Amino acid sequence: MLISPALIPSRPRRPATRLLAAVSLALGLPLAGAAQESVLAPTTVKGQALQSNRAAYSVPVLGREDIQQAAVSEVEALWRQVPGMHVNDYQLGGVANSVVLRGFSGGGHGGDIAATLDGISLNEAMSHADGYFDLNVVVPLELEEVAVHQGPVSVLQGNFNRAGLIELRTRRSGEYREVELQAGSHGTLDAQTALGLRIDDASQLFLAAQHARGDGARPDSGNERSTLSARWQHQLGGGLRIALSGRVHAARGDSPGYLSLAQWLAEPQGKDARVQGDGSQKHFKTLRLDINYDLGKDTHLLAYAYGTSQDFVRWFTRPKAGQWAQREERYARSVAGTGLNLSGTRRSAQWTLGLEALREATDYGYWDDLQDRRRSAPAINDRQATLNNVAAFAQLDWKLHPLFTPSLGLRHDRFTGNCTRLGAETGAEACTRMQRLAHTSPKLGVSSRVNEQLTLRASWSEGFALPGNFAKYALGAAQLDPNVFRQTEVGMQWRASRQLWLDLALYRMASSQEIRNLAPGVYENFGETLRKGAELQAVWTPASTWELRWNYGRAQSRVTQNANAALVGRHVAAVPRYSSTLQARWHMHPDWTLQGALRHVGRMAVDASNSVWSPAYHVADLGLQYRLPASLGLQDATLSLMVRNLADKSYASSMSVIAGERLVAPGAPRSLLLGLQFSL
């Protein structure tokens, strides 16, 4: 476990801009003992029983204080604080970016990383790419903690849990009324609020809302999104507790698209005139029920059920056959899931058993050669894909001795599904019933507390991936096995002194049985990749007024077996050789704090043949915080001024090669943000 020490013109309908104001009316509600911790027992969520048993694995954790200090508008802005984690920002309004972890480059925009919110998966089975997820449905201020399980070490997720698991947990206890406001360059506005209200002696209500908008630094790059979440929990007595929660999100964004390399060098924040009408819009809503029952003092049962409905559309212009063409992708997604968790403690052992079922259906439409969102040809794809997943998992953590604390986990997944054409298609991708696939993934770890200062850990874990996209619905994929990933890791956590704390991890992950396409509709398991790397987190407090944090990750991902011999030994594209974040905070006065950050990102291959490379870059931020006097009537009020990209560095936040043309997503220029945080 890695945790910082305590010392240290479709124009679609616009999201409702009055969303935040409606929730903020609750700020005037009287609270019994505001800012005091509630005596009500919070309801638990899936996997929470495993929260204290992470010592055998690398699991960086960002707590509520870390999240509030970061003052971010988007959850993904936190990843720079996690060693080895990086975001390749596509700068495409409303479209998920690509998250890099453990030598994988396809998290978020693809399926290399699993993501959960209060134990429920955020990954989308067939949206754009298998495992796509959008964290903008989460309000940063509502989070209690964020944990990043590095590698396929968690039993909580199966498919998509390759590079690791992002585990988000919202606040479910306490009484609070918090507000965070930001405004700055390029029309940026972000307003968030989080409320914890005690209704009576047996009930609590938790609300969070966010409205964010911006004009963007480039032409036609405006965006707007709104999110509202609510959770009501009630204690019935006799060890029985229930919780009902819901979430609504709406977003729209315009996109100036990519630039050619020559265009970027000439005008870094410009726009290609061939891009017209690019952008996206999304609507998301979900509802869930949690029932907790205490079977005994040390044994707890959780039952849950949830449903999600979502629609998403994007328009994207890119090179195609010597010209630039716009494509349209539409997704209408519905999800239903349920599960049981049984957990307990017996002497020195903690255990968890789980059973869950999920059904996800996605209506998918794809058109090409549009002109400013106007279709000119029939649909290439018009179909519905369903994916059903039934899984069972178990984990045992046994504190036999401080020098030997093993963790044993096992997860079994079974998948079925079907593909049905909804209308005429011009595409030739397969669309039949999916053959049943199953996989069992073991997880083994051990931690050893040598003394008060030093803890060692080692682990071996396995993850897997199903055939991608519509390959799983092809008759020629009937005999395929899942792509398997096996990780070995060793690590240490060392408190060298009261001023210095270190965590180091070394890992090796080999993938086998990769899936390749031999001919239309025909596939086989062939291909291997080896990923190796190191991750370091350090916290140094040389004086009571100074704090330095350094997160560093180095990754090497190479192809070791491929049908194309020219690719053997090549680096996996879009994985930086290293990433580093150095942060400093100086409390120069009881009410004044100066802070800065320096982010380095190493060079990375852009294409599979490694013929094109994206150069290394670095970006610096500088900020000043002032704690406002209590006489203003606000609690914990802080006024902040932040300059992002202090030197106005011109850099590529991502590069790609499409139809033989090198394209650039320009990084954000220098921007100024004024922020205010307070409680009532």
Predicted regions located by residue number:
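Extracytoplasmic beta-strand/coil segments of soluble accessory domains associated
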Residues: 48, 76, 80-121
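Gram-negative outer-membrane beta-barrel transporters
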Residues: 399-406, 414-415, 502-510, 525-608, ...
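Conserved C-terminal beta-signal and adjacent last beta-strands/turns
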Residues: 247, 396, 458, 488, ...
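A beta-strand signature from Gram-negative outer-membrane beta-barrel systems
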Residues: 137-180
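Surface-exposed extracellular loop regions of Gram-negative outer-membrane beta-barrel proteins
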Residues: 105, 252-254, 258-266, 361-373, ...
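Membrane-embedded beta-barrel scaffold of Gram-negative outer-membrane proteins
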Residues: 292-294, 300-318, 449, 455-461, ...
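Transmembrane beta-barrel wall of Gram-negative outer-membrane proteins
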Residues: 178, 185-213, 218-256, 278-300, ...
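Short, acidic, small-residue-rich periplasmic hinge/interaction motif at the N-terminus
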Residues: 35-68, 76, 117, 294, ...
